[in-house]
Amino acid sequence: MEFKGYIKEKFPYPKVREPQKRMMLKIYECIKNKRNLIVEAPTGVGKTLGYLIPALYFAERRKRVLILTETIDQQVRIYEDLSSLRHNLKVAFLMGKSNFICKSKGGKANRLYCQLNKKCLYRPNKRPICYCGTKKQPVNLGDKVIYYCPYCTCEYQKAKIESILADIVVMNNSMFYYAKEDIEAKRDIDIIICDEAHKLESSIRNTSTIIINPELPINRLKYMAIHYAPNILKKRLDIGDENFWEIIEKYLTSRGINIDICKETIIFDGENLSSWKYKTELAVLGAILDAYYQINNIKNKILRFNENEEIDREELRFEIDNKALIAIELDFIHKKKLSDLYLLEFIENIKNLRYINENYVVYRSGNSLLCEPVFVSSHLKELYGNAVVIHCSATIGNLKMHALKTGLDKAEFLILESPFPKNRKKIIALKDGVDMKYERKDREKANKNLLKILEAINGNSLVLFKSFEDLDSFYKYLKREITKTNIKNKNIHVYEQGMDGKEAKELKERFEKIGGILLATGRFAEGVDIPGEALVGVVIDSLPFPVPTPLILREQKILEERFKIRGVRDAHWRAFLMTSFDRMARTLVQMIGRLIRTENDYGVVVIQDKRFADWVGRVMREKGYLKDNYEVMSLDMAIKYIPKFMSQFKN
């Protein structure tokens, strides 16, 4: 078989792992026969090379390949792995605009600014000679030709052109949503490979969600008002002053300014603002004040809705009548070299509410209005087009459910075994733990259970919580009680609410270096890779069932109604399994997967929430989410068992 010889030629290491070879051959077979495929390849299989070598094989035979993943770090790793394999293909790496510097205004690039800035000197166009005098390079797009200057064209546009011309394109899921049509301007995509595919559904849902948050544009209006205010007024303005807008209104009316017509008098020539009726700075202030009244009115309407209750689309009659506002914000961000267009984004999102269909659910969350798609499978089917689609992940869980939710009709499945020894990991479910369902949970008892488990592990441990409230409760208890225990390494590391990616990475590195106990929420756990004795215990406080938002309730209701129409028994239970349970199970599998990252790792996973021992673990096994076995023990049994188990492997 030609492809087997190709594997030997391309594989960069002395030996191909058997599961890895199975993965390559199955991907090859499915692409050749134009069949979609979902692969669950646990950590250690060598998943990345498992799909890159088939991708190269077909790309070298004139098939165009798109590789998707979730984060820029993962994109970089895939791009570097591709570069390390011998080939003569064009490979492109496309990130979102915010990762580039805008040459036109300085600062981070912005999608909306780029759309509005039609006269931008740094984008490709139909002129063959650049303003700098350089002869531009042509790009043939079917019956159309555009030209770009290799010296002046902005880096995003260069990356986009490279993606249009490339044989293999690497991008994240959000860019797939926004830019797939653009990169097919010259050639269609034949093969789509999605790595970390368990994140695809939520990524596309988040990208297509409309968020109406009046706080951001109102805050932007305040800073704009201070910027354009005359010096005598500027001295009286303070962002935190509750009379901020009243001061501006009194100032304008005292000078005979008709606030209602200011927005109609503004003229913007692309570079400067002016007014045909008033002094420019006063007309601009009047237009800003008018915009505040309109947006504040929308804010008050939003706050009148009950939180976390679905809103009828007929009640979403919002409108902003202020054409000058976009020009003023463009002028402001250009002068201040800012990147975000909060007002323009707000106006665009208000307009987008008109086009939502029955698939969207709208509700208030905090001060914001969320408009989320219930199902994203139809979005994804459109994006897939006629391509063969391959989904890969270490933890997909229920493959049939994943196929249904991500629009992969008639997909084939491949589940690979972990190459790591199973006897080095033990999953323990406490039968006398606390039932952590919100209205029943006993936080004090759960805290005591967690400390006893940590004392039994007596090694570097990660404790995962459903909420920061639970984390904080245990942190206070642990600080008070840890000195009374025999835990050798008493260092405590805490993942705090609001930490950004950089801070979370530093926390993880500090824990790896110093060791001890790391307290975090489930969100922190996904993607965290801590091999060796740096992590020998994962303790899960509570099962990560999601809060029943209007999105989940609507999804569950629709599915239940469909099951009843089809005469399916236990329709409510089936709908629950496909919604709340599915989200919980996929997250829990990710949590469990934090422990064993290499073949020499060992340790225990202890699930404190007794619902796992009572019924959740059994259902997860039956439905294919959990591939590992687990043992049900009492807390006393676990405390005796864990030290004996750990002693077999400790250095």
UniProtKB/Swiss-Prot annotation:
Q: Provide the cofactor note recorded for this chain's UniProt entry.
A: Binds 1 [4Fe-4S] cluster.
Kindly list the cysteine pairs connected by disulfide bridges: none
What is one process in the GO biological process aspect for this record? nucleobase-containing compound metabolic process
Question: What SMART domains does the record point to?
Answer: DEXDc, HELICc2
Q: What role does this protein play?
A: Might be a 5'-3' DNA helicase.
Organism expressing this protein natively: Methanocaldococcus jannaschii (strain ATCC 43067 / DSM 2661 / JAL-1 / JCM 10045 / NBRC 100440) (Methanococcus jannaschii)
Q: What is this protein called?
A: Probable ATP-dependent helicase MJ0942
Q: State the UniProt keywords alphabetically.
A: ATP-binding, DNA-binding, Helicase, Hydrolase, Iron, Iron-sulfur, Isomerase, Metal-binding, Nucleotide-binding
Q: Extra info from the record?
A: The fourth ligand for the [4Fe-4S] cluster could be Cys-130; Cys-132 or Cys-152.
What EC number(s) has UniProt assigned to this enzyme?
A: 5.6.2.3
The Helicase ATP-binding domain sits at 6-255
